[in-house]
Structure formats: structure tokens, C-alpha cells
Design a protein with these regions (language model features):
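Flexible loop/hinge segments that line or gate small-molecule binding clefts
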Residues: 36, 140-181, 200, 293-301, ...
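Beta-alpha junction/loop-to-helix N-cap segments that form part of ligand/metal-binding clefts
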Residues: 111-164, 172-177, 268-275
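Extracytoplasmic "Venus flytrap"
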Residues: 34-66, 70-93, 106-118, 123, ...
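Bacterial lipoprotein signal-peptidase II cleavage site
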Residues: 24-36
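Hydrophobic alpha-helical segments within soluble ligand-binding/sensing domains
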Residues: 62-64, 173-201, 213-214, 246-247, ...
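Hydrophobic alpha-helical
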Residues: 132-151, 219, 239-299
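Hinge/cleft segment of the Venus flytrap/periplasmic-binding protein
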Residues: 36-74, 317-379
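An alpha-beta-alpha
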Residues: 76-79, 94-96, 184-227, 232-236, ...
């Protein structure tokens, strides 16, 4: 796939450059501007598409069959930590699983450059783990070690990795089609939040994340369906700026493009602190994001950020771990369709309901109890 190769290429270059180079000004692409008198967004269609994401009941675990047996005593698992704020959140989410199941979980810091990843993955191979949890780390960075892990029959359960099957790994539940569905939901959310009255949008993406381009593609396709005449700019925000200067880059971009009516961020963590900066700059443009962390939800609950389409990180990490347990036990399983997987883990939150989730969105309130039953633990 052309887009996938482009993203891989960008990620490879990024890994070889210094952090200073990564902070260079992001690139911008745009779709044609709307013609005078063109019809605006189809609000009814946007609401209809988004309906499954907004459901507050009937969301179920993606796999609901019990494990074929107990998790082997002494099971050792490595968590690959890529060093982002979200990765830190996901590590914390795994701790109750350790307590519940008794597994041994090691945190392996991979870094973000080729050399550090190579060193970390060599250690993983030498440590002879029973399984690996990988969130976002592209296999292109550890091909030799991956081949050794596969040869040693060490299963790898992945989250937000786009080419698992192609690289001989179990299929990630949130692969390319899942990401496209999330991108479509973001576009529909933007139309809904602007009440179908905005025609100029900007989408901030992280080019170093292999999954981001699939979300961009989904966003573009759905926005074109909902509003063929709308104008969309796609702006790159370097991964190295997340948590530091990413919000400043958004401010600068909006200052340079006063025609923009609404923004959407693929990595919402990059907009933490943005509302105050926008206010200081006298910018009134509102927006939403996804892959949101608790500070984003706090901004939404406080009314300073318009909305968010958060992913249930708890459900995501427990699902990835559940998959790994099934791989370790050689259990057969099948994922539901991509859109079902997508809307199960996400919803649209606004000031009216974001305060209900101070620690992050929870799609299935009794999720831990349900997983414990599937794993034959905890009671």
C-alpha cells in the first residue's frame, strides 16, 4: 500500500535523525477549497454514522470465549515501552492484570531511534520471554529479532501495529481497517460538533506513527462523503514535540490559517495545555482529538476543549493481553468486523459527560470482572 510505504519511510528517516531535526515545521496538504454556494456538511448522515459509537449499552468484549485452560504459572511477559505519554498510561493499566493473574511483567524501554530499539530487542530475545506486548512499535525496526522470536515460538500481541500478519505475527485487533473506521468517526464527530455549519477543517497528524495515515485516509473519505465541498488541511506534528511544543505548533498553524473553522487531532495528548494557549493568542477555534489521555478529558469536562473521541485504553490493553494469553495457550479465536471493534472501544465525549470519566473513558464498566471469568482467575 502506497500510504503505508510512505509512513514507513518517514518513520525510518525519523529514527536516524536527532530530536532537534524532528522539531522542524510540519508539512501541510489540503483538499480543494469549496466553491461558492456549495452545499455544506450532511449533519443527519454524520449523526447516523456516529450512532454506534455513542451507544452507552450493549458494548461487549471482542472475544468472549473462556481460555482453554489456566494461565501457566510463572508466565513471563515483556511490555515494549516506546517512551510516549500514552505508553506510560498503558503500562499502568497492565498492573492490575499482574496482580490478578500472577504473571511476571517486565517493562522494556525501547527508545525511538534505531540503535536503542535494536539494543532493547536483542535483550528481549536473550531473556526468553513467554510472550511480548507491543504497542505501536513498527516491526521494521526489529526485523532480525522478530525472526528469532518467531523461530523460538514467542507470541507477540500488538496494539496499533499495522503490518502484524505480513510479518508473521498474530493479527492486531486495531489494524488498518480499525484505524480507518476511527478516522471516519473523527470526521463525523467534527461535522456533528460544528452542527454542520463549518466547511474548513484541519487535521493534525503524527507522521511517525504508522497507524496515523490510515486514520487520515478514513477521515478524508468520510468527510468527502459528508461534505464533498469542504476544505481539509492535513498538518504534520512531529512525534518528538508531543508533550512539549506540539500545542504551540497548533497555535501557530491556526494563526497562519484564520479561515479554519475546526481542528481535529489524531494524537490528543499533543493538545494538552492548548486551550490556554489559544485563549492567550485570541484564537476561538474549537476542536477535538482522539487517543486522549486524562488531562484531555479534564479539558473537555471544564469546557476549554470542545470534545474528544477517546479510546478506552483499559479495554484496549486488557484485550491485547487476552489475545496474548490465547496465543500462549494456542487457543483459536476470531475478531469481529473492524467497525464493531472500533466503536466498541470509543465514544464521543463533551462537556456534558466527560466528567464521568476522570481516569479515562470506560466502555464496559465491569470489564475486569468479565476478563477474570474468561481467564479462570479472581474468584
Amino acid at each position: 500500500m502506497t500510504h503505508h510505504r510512505k509512513v514507513r519511510s518517514a518513520l525510518t528517516v525519523t529514527a536516524l535523525l536527532s530530536t532537534a531535526v524532528l522539531v522542524l515545521t510540519g508539512c501541510t496538504t489540503s483538499t480543494p477549497a469549496p466553491t461558492t454556494g456549495a452545499k455544506g456538511p450532511d449533519l443527519a448522515a454524520a449523526k447516523s454514522f456516529l450512532a454506534p459509537w455513542l451507544a452507552t449499552t450493549d458494548k461487549k468484549l471482542l472475544i468472549d470465549q473462556p481460555l482453554s485452560g489456566s494461565i501457566p504459572a510463572g508466565t513471563r511477559i515483556a511490555f515494549l515501552d516506546v517512551g510516549t505519554p500514552v505508553a506510560a498510561v498503558m503500562w499502568d493499566i497492565l498492573q492490575p492484570i499482574v496482580k490478578l493473574t500472577g504473571i511476571k511483567l517486565d517493562r522494556v524501554s525501547t527508545g525511538s531511534d534505531a540503535q536503542s530499539i535494536n539494543t532493547a530487542m536483542n535483550t528481549v530475545v536473550e531473556s526468553k520471554y513467554d510472550g511480548i506486548i507491543n504497542i505501536t512499535l513498527d516491526p521494521i525496526f526489529f526485523k532480525p529479532q522478530l525472526q528469532q522470536l518467531i523461530a523460538n515460538k514467542v507470541p507477540i500481541a500488538s496494539g496499533s501495529v499495522m503490518d502484524t500478519v505480513e510479518n508473521g505475527m498474530p493479527e492486531a485487533f486495531n489494524g488498518p481497517d480499525w484505524m480507518k473506521s476511527e478516522g471516519q468517526a473523527l470526521a463525523a464527530s467534527a461535522v456533528v460538533r460544528t452542527n454542520g455549519k463549518v466547511n474548513d477543517f484541519v487535521l493534525y497528524t503524527i507522521p511517525e506513527f504508522p497507524f496515523a495515515q490510515f486514520q487520515v485516509d478514513g477521515f478524508k473519505s468520510k468527510l468527502k462523503d459528508l461534505c464533498p465541498a469542504c476544505n481539509l488541511r492535513v498538518v504534520d506534528i512531529p512525534i518528538a514535540t508531543l508533550g512539549s511544543t506540539s500545542a504551540d505548533q497548533v497555535v501557530s498553524d491556526l494563526q497562519a490559517h484564520p479561515e479554519t473553522g475546526y481542528y481535529v487531532a489524531i494524537a490528543d495528548e499533543g493538545t494538552v495545555g492548548l486551550p490556554a494557549k489559544l485563549n492567550l493568542a485570541g484564537i476561538t477555534v474549537k476542536g477535538l482529538g482522539t487517543w486522549s489521555i486524562p488531562p484531555n478529558l479534564q479539558q473537555v469536562a471544564g469546557g476549554t476543549q470542545d470534545a474528544t473521541l477517546p479510546i478506552d485504553f483499559n479495554l484496549m490493553m486488557w484485550t491485547v493481553t487476552d489475545q496474548l494469553f490465547r496465543e500462549i495457550l494456542h487457543d483459536k479465536y476470531k475478531w469481529p468486523d473492524a467497525q464493531t471493534r472500533a466503536y466498541t472501544l470509543a465514544t464521543l465525549l463533551t462537556k456534558d459527560n466527560a466528567g464521568n470519566y476522570p481516569n479515562g473513558y470506560a466502555a464496559i464498566p465491569d470489564m475486569q470482572k468479565q476478563f477474570a471469568a474468561l481467564w479462570h482467575v479472581g474468584g
